[in-house]
Amino acid sequence: MRPSGRKTDQMRKVSFERNFSKHAEGSCLVRFGDTHVLCTASLEDKVPGWLRNGGKGWVTAEYGMLPRATGERMRREASAGKQSGRTQEIQRLIGRSLRAVVDLPALGERQISVDCDVIQADGGTRTASITGAWIALHDCLKWMEARNMVKLEKVLKDHVAAISCGIFASQPVVDLDYLEDSAAETDANFVMTGSGGLVEIQGTAEGKPFSEEEFASLMLLAKNGIAELIEMQKLAIAG
């Protein structure tokens, strides 16, 4: 039995609140249960120096957690003077996931920076960030299209979403919350596109290695979960 009482293939309640920020070109407050992440997409009329005059744009991401997003207050990384390895890993993952579905030449020589700020954490912050970041990116591109800067359908090639899976109490489960994640025998994150393409898989065994059969079970849970998330994205942007 899962601590939340959910079935093995049951995700937490997911919601997307678009246009959460009045300043950003695109924004979304995404909720995966008690994990809440504010995703904002900001347009910059420039590209990194190494891309200058290259005829294409760039999409990048930054990730952070508010000091009291967790049970005990964490020190701000800015006050510590450096980002943790975890933060750097997650923001690179978010950026890679978004770029997998963007036609960078169609964006022109512009950069979209997506900031994912965790307001409240209860497991799965990176997967919620990726899934919500896609909505924010979509709305930023829609803002640009309204000003004749790009064609949305030419720049954004597909959906992308992410979900965590793991083996908890010897059972494969989807969308782990913190209690499950901290006690899981295996923990994995999957990033996939709307057409079923795999962007990234991260999987780790805690003590006991997992079998190929167990991995196949996690993969199936992830595939079905991400398909659900992408349908939710479609409903959100249609509203």
From Swiss-Prot:
Q: Which Gene3D superfamilies match?
A: GHMP Kinase, N-terminal domain
One Pfam entry for this protein is: RNase_PH_C
UniProt: phosphate binding residues: R86, G124, T125, R126
List the Gene Ontology MF annotations in alphabetical order.
3'-5'-RNA exonuclease activity; tRNA binding; tRNA nucleotidyltransferase activity
| The UniProt record lists the keyword Oxidoreductase | no
According to the lineage, what is the superkingdom?
Bacteria
Give its E.C. classification number. 2.7.7.56
Q: Which GO terms describe its biological process?
A: rRNA catabolic process; rRNA processing; tRNA processing
Q: Which InterPro entries does its entry note? A: ExoRNase_PH_dom1 (IPR001247), ExoRNase_PH_dom2 (IPR015847), ExoRNase_PH_dom2_sf (IPR036345), PNPase/RNase_PH_dom_sf (IPR027408), Ribosomal_Su5_D2-typ_SF (IPR020568), RNase_PH (IPR050080), RNase_PH_bac-type (IPR002381), RNase_PH_CS (IPR018336)
Q: Does the keyword Transmembrane apply?
A: no
Query: Which terms are listed as keywords in the entry?
Result: Nucleotidyltransferase, RNA-binding, rRNA processing, Transferase, tRNA processing, tRNA-binding
Q: Which reaction does it catalyse?
A: tRNA(n+1) + phosphate = tRNA(n) + a ribonucleoside 5'-diphosphate
Q: Which HAMAP family match?
A: RNase_PH
Family the entry assigns: Belongs to the RNase PH family.
**Functional description taken from the UniProt entry:** Phosphorolytic 3'-5' exoribonuclease that plays an important role in tRNA 3'-end maturation. Removes nucleotide residues following the 3'-CCA terminus of tRNAs; can also add nucleotides to the ends of RNA molecules by using nucleoside diphosphates as substrates, but this may not be physiologically important. Probably plays a role in initiation of 16S rRNA degradation (leading to ribosome degradation) during starvation.
Cite the record's note on assembly.
Homohexameric ring arranged as a trimer of dimers.
Which named protein is this? Answer: Ribonuclease PH
Organism, per UniProt?
Answer: Sinorhizobium medicae (strain WSM419) (Ensifer medicae)
Q: Which gene encodes it?
A: rph
